[in-house]
Swiss-Prot record:
The gene is cpcG2. The keyword Ribosomal protein does not apply. The phycobilisome is a hemidiscoidal structure that is composed of two distinct substructures: a core complex and a number of rods radiating from the core. It is found in: Cellular thylakoid membrane. InterPro entries: PBS_linker_dom, PBS_linker_sf, Phycobilisome. The lineage of its organism: Bacteria, Bacillati, Cyanobacteriota, Cyanophyceae, Nostocales. This is Phycobilisome rod-core linker polypeptide CpcG2. It comes from Mastigocladus laminosus (Fischerella sp.).
Length: 247
């Protein structure tokens, strides 16, 4: 039996308060499926979804989910299902889930799927228990199927950072891995600038010695080049005057 989600009290955030700001360059552009009738517009919506979920401005071709893109272009799935598929993809699992703790996975997922930061530590603990009991896939389903997601984004809107006021965008303050994984990567490679690193590098080099097999000259058999047969035929003189007449 799955453990129910623990209760937590929401804290005050900008997205919970109605805003009256004048739209400017910081206002996020909202991508809706009903506003994308042409091929170029649906492509912009797809790339907006990639940027939101993967938090990268350049998406590698290797990370693209071609099957999901095709289904969305043919209107066989909604944007909400497309977001669900991106969050459950193998690329997201390898880039984000495997490189972070459950608490940081909760923070990243709330920012990229629900468009807001965690309310408090209690919410992070509650969702981390959800990951431990139902797995990351069950956690994604709980976010995408939540009432909060439905109210703010519905079925055909790409999630975005809600009511960003003065703060930097989430993709600039929340890289795909934290300090723990960064320090682990630093420990696994050599850092330039310290002479001790060169000494450690030299010690880590394994020199493969070549084993030579000693050879005794007494054991080398020299082939016999003497002739045992007598040459046959008419002998020819090597004197040119005997072979060629002189004029």
């Amino acid at each position: 039996m799955a453990i129910p989600l623990l209760q937590y009290k929401p804290s005050s955030q900008n997205q919970r308060v109605p805003g009256y700001e004048v739209p400017n360059e910081d206002t996020p552009r909202i991508y809706r499926l009903e506003d994308a009738p042409s091929y170029s517009e649906i492509q912009e919506l797809i790339w907006a979804a990639y940027r939101q979920i993967f938090s990268e401005h350049e998406i590698l071709k290797f990370h693209r989910q071609i099957n999901l893109e095709s289904q969305l272009k043919n209107r066989t799935i909604t944007v909400r299902d497309f977001i669900r598929g991106l969050a459950k993809s193998e690329a997201f699992q390898r880039l984000v889930v495997e490189t972070n703790s459950n608490y940081r996975i909760v923070e990243i997922s709330l920012k990229r799927i629900l468009g807001r930061a965690p309310y408090n530590r209690e919410e992070e603990i509650a969702w981390s228990i959800k990951i431990a009991t139902d797995g990351f896939g069950g956690f994604v389903d709980a976010l995408v199927d939540s009432e909060e997601y439905q109210i703010n984004f519905g079925d055909n809107t790409v999630p975005y950072q809600r009511r960003r006021f003065k703060d930097r965008p989430f993709n600039l303050v929340t890289p795909r891995y934290g300090n723990y994984w960064r320090d682990k990567l630093e420990n696994e490679r050599y850092i330039a600038g310290d002479i001790k690193n060169f000494l450690d590098l030299a010690k880590s080099i394994e020199i493969k010695t070549v084993s030579y097999q000693p050879v005794s000259t007494a054991n080398i058999s020299i082939p016999d080049t003497t002739r045992n047969t007598v040459p046959r035929g008419i002998p020819v003189s090597v004197n040119p005057s005997a072979s060629f007449p002189l004029r």
